[in-house]
Amino acid sequence: MDLSTMSYGCTASRDAEATLNLVLRALELSGQRGVLLSGWASIGKGRALPSHVFSAESLPHSWLFPRMAAVVHHGGAGTTGAGLRSGVPSVLTPLAADQPSWARRVHTLGVGPAPLPLQTLTAERLAEAIREAATSPAMRQRAAELGRQIQAEDGLGRISELFSQYVDRWGRLRRDQG
């Protein structure tokens, strides 16, 4: 039995209890153990959970995600970035804002199954997506490759370089117009 993270911490759900029940059923159907990150939404807080589910309000994504078979989340920019960097396939269940775009991008990159919008999500569809993410050799390999590429990037150095170029260009523009 593999281990998957379910992160719905800041997703505003009208019915957190229904979301929790769906997630628990999906884990059961998929044969996965789960780490449920409850976060701000407090999903599952104070409720007895099955023995194959561990719950925490928060854990560092950089530590947790690489240890998982799959990461299931809403598709916010931060969680998506952490998932991509971890080198582990992601199952995205977008709700609103930029989440659908990130979900499509993860799928297009080959590091996650097709997006499963939270509004129409079923336990059966989520379980199938978790199984696919956790067991697809091609998806796992592509996620690992992309994770290594992202980890090798010098993001801070690159943004510093781009910012310097921008400042230089702006300075030249002002002098030329001056």
What are these regions (language model features)?
Residues 56-105:
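A donor-sugar binding/catalytic signature common to diverse glycosyltransferases
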